[in-house]
Amino acid sequence: VGVLHSLSGTMAISETALKETALMTIADINSKGGVMGRPIEAVVVDPASNWPLFAEKARQLITQEKVVATFGCWTSVSRKSVLPVFKELNSILYYPVQYEGEELEKNVFYTGAAPNQQAIPATEYLMSKEGGGAKRFFLLGTDYVYPRTTNKILRAFLHSKGVTDKDIQETYTPFGHGDYQ
């Protein structure tokens, strides 16, 4: 199986843990005899937090390394960059983290929560008496697909609950930004 997570660059701090989890799980399965008596072999590549490189590395895993499935990506932009490769080569991607929804591909197993399963319930709680009865909201995120789409969904939800635009602020930072002074 392929393991397609950034081990260097901006996303390494998050994705390295996913790589380690995949390897730990594979080791556990292999310690119990593997799958149908055969051990699973992990092929790990580093797309280095470089979105176009994700597609190149996915193609390498499928065509050169002959993996039957790939566990990988964190950001929506990395997932979207590999989708054409998985579709073209009819291979499987297991996408392990939350995502913005609004996408359904037969070659992807989405294992994380969508906004209606995570952000909406959290916002409902914040608006409840138990959650503090919030009436004003600040939507923020990194400037890419997941935060923008999730915040669009949250804004529509807040409007449906009577919250007006004057009580909603929205801000995005560039990817890799670290100076919040």
Give the predicted meaning of each segment.
Residues V1-A17, C73-W74, R136-T142:
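Short beta-strand segments enriched in small/hydrophobic residues
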Residues V3, T16, K80, I120, ...:
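Residues forming the Rossmann-fold NAD(P)(H) cofactor-binding site
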Residues T16-M24, Q117, P121:
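A general alpha-helical scaffold signature found inside nucleotide-binding enzyme cores
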Residues V1, E20-A42, G132, H159-K166:
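Signal peptide-proximal N-terminal region
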Residues I13-E20, K32-E102, T111, Y172-Y180:
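Beta-alpha junction/loop-to-helix N-cap segments that form part of ligand/metal-binding clefts
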Residues E56, E100, N107-Q181:
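Extracellular/periplasmic Venus flytrap/periplasmic-binding protein
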Residues V1-I13, F86-K87, Y94-Y95, E100-G101, ...:
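Glycine/serine-rich loop-strand microenvironments at binding/catalytic pocket rims
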